[in-house]
Amino acid sequence: GVESVAIDPNNDQKVYLACGTYTIMTGSILKSNDGGRSFIEVKVPIAMGGNENGRGNGERMMVDPLNSRNIYFGTRLNGLWRSVDEGMTWKRVDSFPDVTEQTDFSNPQNRMNRGSGIIAVVFDKKEKKGNDAKNIFVAVSLKDRQSIFVSRDAGKSWKAIDNQPVGLRPTHMVMAADRKLYISYADSPGPSDMTDGALWSYD
């Protein structure tokens, strides 16, 4: 299964796929330099769940629009990862907060509605720090605690944004041309057992 797809906004011939069907095994990043006609496989020590709950969340992997060498990938179980060489090598971003979800998964209902890890990465392309995007937003599938984080220094440090809702899980996050974030929420990562949701914006 494919967990996430990213296209270089500066070169649409460069395509990245995060591949792995279930989190019981590690996956791979596939990279194409020719618009998807051929791919290079880069094995990574990251558990992916392209056929698990939350498979419609996203987008987990994004290319920095101000520096195409930088790619961020939000994982289900292994935190936030970054490549600085166009996807050829990957390293965990240790400065990102611990977003482990403490839930009793012995309850079948809890297992069905558990979060799906880091579900979205969004770059603000309007501000630069050095060669990189200065402001990076990350959404995590957390229900009862803060779930949207921002870095104002190109990924060196992170904090939760102010005045965010709790009680629902983020499912998608995008930034409009006016730099406003739009975040959709639901009571489950989906596609199963989703009965409630909301849409919030953040200036």
Where are these regions (language model features)?
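Extracellular glycan-interacting surfaces
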Residues: G1-D203
